[in-house]
Regions:
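The beta1-alpha1 cofactor-binding region of Rossmann-like NAD(H)/NADP(H)-dependent oxidoreductases
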Residues: 69-70, 91-101, 133
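Residue(s) in the substrate-gating loop at a strand-loop-helix junction
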Residues: 171
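Active-site helix of classical SDR
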Residues: 151, 187
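Conserved glycine-rich Rossmann-like NAD(P)H-binding loop of the short-chain dehydrogenase/reductase
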Residues: 58-74
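C-terminal helical subdomain
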Residues: 211, 231-269
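Substrate-binding pocket helix/loop in short-chain dehydrogenase/reductase
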Residues: 127-128, 132-137
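Conserved glycine-rich cofactor-binding loop
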Residues: 44-45
Length: 309
């Protein structure tokens, strides 16, 4: 028992030291975004819109991708004062032909792709056995398959130029699973694993990958009811502008992983890694009837047409 206790404490201390070193170590910018060509999926609202502003303010050439052309045109007008060139491509990234068209039109316009931001995503909540199978399939296709396939399509031009950056927008739930979000968590675990694996595969090729792990965020995917509920547990709900700025800053610094969501999010990730039983107990306490009811309501609303970011 004493050995087990010492092992657990040693693991927790080692994990804490690792995150402290990652947080405080000096970093040096390696990427200048001026005139770089940046594709952003899910760019019509929420975090995607905030990312468009963050890149535009750094004078990047921004390619806006989402399903709704009218919303994309609104974002285009908003960011045009900051950047020399904006390309709008209405597309359903769950479709192979649309993904190919995004890459083809970008290369036809700019001749290269410097940065790919896989941001588009959909979510749903509630008990897994009650979730709509069509919605689950769409989530797998948008959150995971589309990011992998679009990355596969842009890699040839990046590898040919020995230069490229891929920014994958994951979730803190990719490192610390939460009940009532089983399919969504599965897609984010998959995206995190894909990012980690591909980063090692592309070592020394000039192509770099960064994974962003946001916490709860003010977007169309989070209702006021959920915001109020998670706030009672002491979890911050961050603004997309803050998340976008931190993501772009981490990208230009060459960071591999950017963890957001406050101290509790970091503690949750550490607990998942070094004390999973403790985290399981915590989630059992969280699973109040009110939490289950709220998540079930979200799942029903999403099944009737929840939005993509």
């Amino acid at each position: 028992m004493r050995l087990l206790r010492h092992t657990l404490w040693g693991g927790l201390l080692a994990g804490a030291a690792y995150w402290l070193v990652r947080y405080f170590r000096p970093r040096h910018s390696t990427l200048v975004l001026n005139e770089k060509v940046v594709i952003i999926t899910g760019a019509s609202s929420g975090l995607g819109r905030a990312l468009a502003f963050a890149f535009a303010r750094r004078a990047a050439r921004v390619v806006l991708v989402a399903r709704h052309e009218d919303r994309l045109e609104t974002v285009r007008r908003e960011i045009e004062p900051y950047t020399s060139d904006v390309l709008v491509i209405p597309a359903d990234i769950a479709q192979e032909d649309d993904l190919r068209r995004v890459v083809e039109q970008t290369l036809a316009r700019f001749g290269r792709i410097d940065v790919l931001v896989n941001n588009a995503g959909i979510s749903t909540g509630g008990p897994f056995q009650e979730q709509d199978p069509a919605r689950v399939e769409a989530m797998l296709r948008v959150n995971l398959w589309a990011a992998m396939r679009l990355t596969q399509l842009v890699l040839p031009t990046m590898l040919a130029n020995n230069h490229g950056y891929i920014l994958n927008i994951g979730s803190g739930l990719a490192r610390a699973a939460i009940p009532m979000f089983a399919p969504y968590v599965a897609t984010k675990y998959g995206l995190a694993g894909f990012t980690d694996t591909l980063r090692r595969e592309l070592h020394r090729t000039g192509v770099h990958l960064t994974l962003v792990l946001p916490g709860w965020m003010h977007t169309d995917m989070i209702t006021p009811e959920v915001e109020e509920l998670v706030g009672r547990y002491g979890l911050p709900v961050e603004h997309p502008d803050f998340v976008a700025e931190r993501a772009v800053l981490g990208l230009v610094r060459g960071e591999h992983e950017i963890v957001l969501g406050g101290v509790l999010a970091r503690l949750g990730i550490l607990a998942e890694r070094y004390a999973p039983l403790l985290l399981s107990i915590y989630w059992r306490l969280w699973m109040t009837p009110e939490w289950v009811s709220t998540m079930r309501k979200i799942g029903q609303e999403d099944a009737n047409g929840g939005g993509w970011r």
